[in-house]
């Protein structure tokens, strides 16, 4: 497994040094980053927007600005929403998460990609 593809569980159930790299983090990345930035940054939302959206868009030369004529690529995030991460409820085919059973704060509630709603809680 590579290129951000999920690994089968049996591929991860081996010694650490021979297991394929990576863990699922699609649903946990933003809450984890937000919690850390709340402690370290004056404006955590600005840092997240810049480092997880604006800069990557520039790197791959995509105009991802929210403006008339552009397709929506955005999400709604509730920074106060508390939830417990469960790999059984995760939307990934992979089943390896270091956050299994952890109480999380902050949750993505809605996502649009290329102008289409692709996720809604």
What do the predicted segments below correspond to?
Residues 2-79:
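His/Asp/Glu-enriched, well-ordered alpha-helical/loop segment
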Residues 15, 68-121:
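C-terminal cap of metal-dependent C-N hydrolases
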């Amino acid at each position: 497994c590579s290129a951000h593809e999920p690994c089968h569980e049996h591929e991860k159930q081996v010694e650490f040094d021979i297991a394929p790299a990576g863990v699922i983090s699609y649903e946990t990345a933003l809450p984890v980053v937000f919690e850390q930035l709340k402690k370290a940054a004056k404006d955590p939302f600005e840092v997240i927007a810049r480092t997880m959206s604006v800069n990557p868009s520039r790197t791959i030369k995509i105009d991802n600005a929210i403006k008339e004529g552009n397709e929506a690529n955005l999400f709604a995030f509730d920074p106060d929403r508390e939830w417990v991460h469960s790999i059984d409820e995760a939307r990934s085919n992979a089943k390896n998460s270091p956050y299994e059973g952890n109480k999380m704060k902050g949750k993505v509630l809605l996502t649009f990609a290329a102008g289409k709603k692709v996720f809604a809680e």
